[in-house]
């Protein structure tokens, strides 16, 4: 009897060893979600093996580094010629290569090039220590050049190497490195609220399906966040001002929804999310129904406030040929209506997220959203 038990145990162990030897590669669900949010076209290319993928000379270049930190970082960067070649090749891939949400108004070639430039930026900022566009609120956890920073970069390179068989990131080793660099810095802001509409905006999304938009003057009241400069303060004084303005405007009945936009930005390391705190205040202090509120908890700047709000309007099925209403405190309202804001949008986004229309009061401007706002841009990996 004992011999039979030993025999059965040995057989079970043998079967387990065989099963493990033939097991599928391990998929990191966090990495998969982050890569899909930041680099959807590159993920699609790796999944289908269609169009141009990573050039063979890149793999040779990386293999020659033997995991040496400076070499791996340098070899992982995409040259302009490589970006052009891969983007041009991607444009020739079958339409079935791409998910509907991957390709924006300017096409596959532009999207792939945008993602590769964004990938370079992640490696430069989080790997090489290049200053980000907004150094006061963005960038790695540790000071570039410090022992902690250098150690984190080395760890990221090893983590990326250990993940080379991850089926979600097969496009190129640089994609795994970029995600690893973000991961070791706990830079997961871009997916912190996903699935956003189904998990956090489900009530409003359901209501939008039965809305008769013609009954309203505006599709939504847009409220940009005003972050506090204090880590312990959930909502700034101007944020509270904006919430009151929103409540008054909603009570007029001219818009079916209030869209609250703002992430946890100021100061660096803040944990209170502007959109979430404003939603809480609207419900608890002013009695605005939850199903009339949409949160947009990713925008880190006024430019992306309007870009991301446009994305939420499109998700709601709101008509883009109808005005929405931006309501915010006077200084920010003046800024949104200024040539400086137009210039900043063109410089940072490459387009205007919509048309700024009539000024109705010192705190109110009309806004007509643009579908250009659907372009994913990982140049800001915390809010693409």
Tell me what each language-model feature is.
Residues 4-12:
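Sec-dependent signal peptide recognition
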Residues 13-14, 236:
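Generic secretory/membrane-interface signal
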Residues 6, 23-24:
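Long acidic/mixed-charge intrinsically disordered regions
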Residues 24-384:
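A structural signal for short, hydrophobic/glycine-enriched beta-strand patches
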Residues 14-22:
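Hydrophobic h-region of N-terminal signal peptides that target proteins for export
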Residues 12-13, 355:
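Residue-level detector of alpha-helical transmembrane segments in integral membrane proteins
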């Amino acid at each position: 009897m004992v011999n039979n038990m030993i025999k059965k145990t040995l057989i079970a162990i043998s079967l387990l060893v065989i099963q493990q030897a033939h097991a599928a590669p391990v998929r990191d669900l966090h990495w998969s979600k982050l890569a899909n949010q930041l680099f959807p076209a590159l993920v699609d290319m790796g999944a289908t093996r269609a169009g141009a993928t990573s050039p063979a000379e890149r793999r040779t270049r990386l293999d020659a580094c033997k995991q040496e930190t400076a070499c791996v970082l340098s070899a992982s960067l995409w040259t302009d010629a490589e970006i052009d070649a891969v983007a041009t090749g991607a444009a020739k891939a079958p339409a079935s290569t791409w998910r509907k949400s991957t390709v924006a108004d300017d096409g596959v070639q532009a999207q792939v090039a945008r993602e590769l430039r964004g990938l370079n930026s992640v490696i430069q900022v989080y790997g090489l220590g290049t200053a980000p566009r907004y150094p006061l609120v963005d960038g790695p956890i540790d000071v570039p050049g410090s022992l902690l920073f250098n150690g984190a970069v080395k760890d990221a390179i090893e983590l990326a190497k250990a993940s080379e068989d991850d089926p979600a990131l097969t496009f190129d080793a640089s994609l795994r490195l970029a995600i690893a660099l973000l991961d070791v810095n706990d830079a997961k802001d871009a997916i912190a609220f996903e699935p956003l509409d189904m998990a956090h905006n489900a009530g409003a999304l359901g209501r939008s399906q039965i809305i008769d938009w013609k009954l309203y003057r505006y599709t939504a009241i847009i409220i940009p966040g005003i972050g506090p400069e204090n880590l312990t303060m959930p909502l700034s004084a101007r944020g509270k001002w904006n919430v009151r303005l929103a409540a008054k405007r909603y009570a007029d009945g001219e818009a079916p929804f209030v869209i609250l936009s703002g992430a946890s930005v100021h100061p660096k390391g803040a944990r209170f999310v502007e959109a979430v705190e404003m939603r809480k205040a609207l419900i608890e202090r002013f009695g605005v129904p939850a199903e009339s509120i949409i949160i947009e908890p990713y925008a880190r700047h006024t430019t992306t406030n309007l870009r991301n709000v446009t994305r939420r309007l499109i998700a709601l099925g709101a008509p883009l040929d109808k005005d929405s209403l931006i309501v915010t405190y006077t200084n920010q309202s003046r800024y949104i209506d200024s040539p400086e804001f137009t210039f900043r949008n063109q410089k940072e986004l490459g387009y205007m997220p919509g048309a700024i229309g009539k000024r109705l009061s010192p705190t109110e401007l009309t806004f007509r959203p643009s579908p250009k706002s659907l372009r994913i841009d990982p140049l800001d990996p915390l809010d693409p």
